[in-house]
Amino acid sequence: MIFRSTPIPGAWIVEPEARADERGFFARSWCRREFEARGLAPDFAQVNIGYNFKKGTLRGLHFQTSPWQEVKLVRCTWGAIYDVMVDLRPDSPTYKQWVGVELTEDNHQLLYVPEGCAQGYQTLIDDTEMCYQTSQFYAPDAASGVRFDDPAFGIVWPLPATLISKADRSWPYHSV
């Protein structure tokens, strides 16, 4: 696996190294040894799948509060998404900064989102599925989020947001 750093400390783009032959290819999307060697969360508690019917659907920006803060490892398994993470760690040099990465069924890249960062995505085509591993179990009382259009972050989404849940539209703006 190839690990590419991002401007946000602790966040990585992970590229599986495919071994191809006439049948197709094989690649690892997670390896405890390789993640531990970089000081990254070695274990995950849950794997989630999100399916979206329509291009432009926006989900997020989500995170869990302490003591249920979580690491996420996000991958698009079908279709294409623009995945965004925002650094919400007040002591971080990149506090309130964001990174966006296009994850597709073809590039097989994963985004490693560290604790203390919010994450969300927008679908770039119809019929898109994403899969993400989390280091903590879902804790409804700790579920939180910030608005996708918060001017404190200035996120530039690639498409107009055509479908957003009521819950995601009701997240508060982050204090400036």
Language-model features, listed with the residues they occupy:
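Short catalytic/ligand-binding loop motif for oxyanion handling, primarily in non-cytosolic enzymes
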Residues: F26, Y121-Q122
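Non-catalytic, conserved peripheral segments adjacent to functional cores
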Residues: M1-Q109, D127, T134-V176
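Conserved SET/PR-domain catalytic core that frames the SAM/AdoMet-binding pocket
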Residues: T104-Y121
